[in-house]
């Protein structure tokens, strides 16, 4: 599905940008703890952006329905990485409760991809 290729590419692009911003723009402005949180958000955004690219490519060439997996990964990025970026910049922990929701969405998204692939292969 074209939307997942676009979302994947945009998220990978944003991960490169946020990584560069963290390394150059935030250096010395955030404590090591919050820099580590920023880097984790960037890393997970990149991994799952690449996952979205793969889902977009798979959905365009087979009959596997991976749309649910794609949307779960996308919203996982929003909740997980988004809340970590916010936490790193503001040190406001209230949105920290949202981070695990994003992690669960990632896990379910990958599981849905496995199940869809097994159904197709089976």
Curated annotation (Swiss-Prot):
Compartments, record wording: Cell membrane
Keywords: Cell membrane, Membrane, Transmembrane, Transmembrane helix
PANTHER family cross-referenced by the UniProt entry: TRANSMEMBRANE PROTEIN 256
Top-level lineage group: Bacteria
Family: Belongs to the UPF0382 family.
Transmembrane segments: 3-23, 46-66, 69-89, 98-118
Full protein name: UPF0382 membrane protein SERP0230
Pfam family, one: DUF423
Membrane topology listed for this record: Multi-pass membrane protein
Lineage: Bacteria, Bacillati, Bacillota, Bacilli, Bacillales
GO cellular component term of the entry, any: plasma membrane
